[in-house]
Amino acid sequence: MITVSAETPMEEVIKLCQAQRITRVPVWRLQTGQRRVIGVVTLKTSLYEPDFDPAKQAGDYLQPPLYLPEDLHLESALKRMQRSGQWLAIVTRQDRREVGIVALQDILRVLFGEVGR
């Protein structure tokens, strides 16, 4: 999974997204010596901001992250993601430590199999 620091200029985020053919990137910041995901940058939302500036940092264009516990059933995870409108979620342990990231596409693939484009 590709992530960027909150201090990464949006110009770099855009280039990274183009190179990797992605539209959403989790953003992290060091907190007490550990990387913590603090949000998600979505290109579509960022680029349509009236005051968008590619020199600004990724942290200036964050959407709040959705956290899902690692033991949550997939059907419940799907419902939470649908309600929140998020396409990415941060998976956490009971102690709130981050253990991974799941995309809506991953959940749909597991529940329904591959869907043609």
Predicted features by range, described:
Residues 1-117:
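Soluble cytosolic regulatory domains appended to membrane proteins
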